[in-house]
């Protein structure tokens, strides 16, 4: 072989080597000081057995489109009294995956004092997502979240599937509080499916948005499947439309279904196209279905106000059992003319201590 040919081949080899993608090991985050460089260089990222320092946010915000992030092993967030969030993920068309056996541990047991976000120890919120363009988060396991677990904001289209949120240790001595599973704002086209939530507050809390599907959820210990609107001074943020809960179970919870409007501010549009289909309940101790237009500053007043009308609440095959001295199957308190087009079928409950109480009676149900 001529010296010239050897030189050509060597140059080609160097060119191929320089074009080779960054090695997998260089795209693994196992130390907090690697986060920024890995996000800047990689599109297939692994977070492996990471310990996040106290008072720091694991900020996985990427400007690249189509990035994949995989959590392996145990990601632990060190204790500090602060507001958080512990974890932030933002991106377009991103995929976030929990590998088999992985867990994100918020160490909530170090914070819980029975007061949640209402006082006592300052507690960090856990997980904040802003994801668009068909992003998918799947098989994520969250353990012992200090306070509100998960916030979805300015997102969609977005799918979350196969999640497991376990804050059940907070049940002991009623120390866990305000541990909402998913709080959702300013989002369009969201699906959450095949997910388990064990907590002490709302399993799902929809505050604003359109075109939501929640399917095959298993919720226990909290406040049920909730819609809560009216707390923002921005009218558009008090809008909810086209929301479906289906094929889900609510166990050992304060409420099964909770729909409430707050009358500090007005909504632009009435709530429409709200559907609960094939919902089973077990051990509900307050209300199986609770619709209230009387909330102010986080509490019911007994005086309903029609600032945000509810026009269209469809319940189909919603059944279950209640328990305890406070239990009531259905409680509806609506302002005059502010509730309409409630069409229910196959709605029945057993074991309640009190009869249903409705200021507006749905078609297909007897209060």
Swiss-Prot record:
Q: In which tissues is it expressed?
A: Expressed in larval carcasses and gut, and adult gut.
The reaction(s) catalysed by this protein are:
(1,4-alpha-D-galacturonosyl)n+m + H2O = (1,4-alpha-D-galacturonosyl)n + (1,4-alpha-D-galacturonosyl)m
* Origin superkingdom: Eukaryota
InterPro entries given for it? Glyco_hydro_28, Glycosyl_hydrlase_28, PbH1, Pectin_lyas_fold, Pectin_lyase_fold/virulence
UniProt EC number: 3.2.1.15
- Residues bearing glycans: 185, 242, 343, 357
Q: Which Pfam families match?
A: Glyco_hydro_28
Q: Signal peptide span per the entry?
A: 1-19
Q: Which UniProt keywords apply?
A: Cell wall, Cell wall biogenesis/degradation, Cleavage on pair of basic residues, Digestion, Disulfide bond, Glycoprotein, Glycosidase, Hydrolase, Repeat, Secreted, Signal, Zymogen
Q: Which cysteines are joined by disulfide bonds?
A: 27-42, 203-219, 334-339, 358-367
Ranges of the PbH1 repeats in the UniProt entry: 187-208, 240-261
Q: Where in the cell is it found?
A: Secreted; Secreted, Cell wall
Q: Does the keyword rRNA processing apply?
A: no
Q: Which residues form the active site?
A: 201, 223
Predominant location category: secreted
MF terms per GO, please? polygalacturonase activity
The UniProt entry's GO CC annotations, sorted and at most eight, read: extracellular region
Q: What's a BP term from Gene Ontology annotated to this protein?
A: cell wall organization
Q: Which family does it belong to?
A: Belongs to the glycosyl hydrolase 28 family.
Protein's recorded name: Polygalacturonase
Q: What is the lineage of its organism?
A: Eukaryota, Metazoa, Ecdysozoa, Arthropoda, Hexapoda
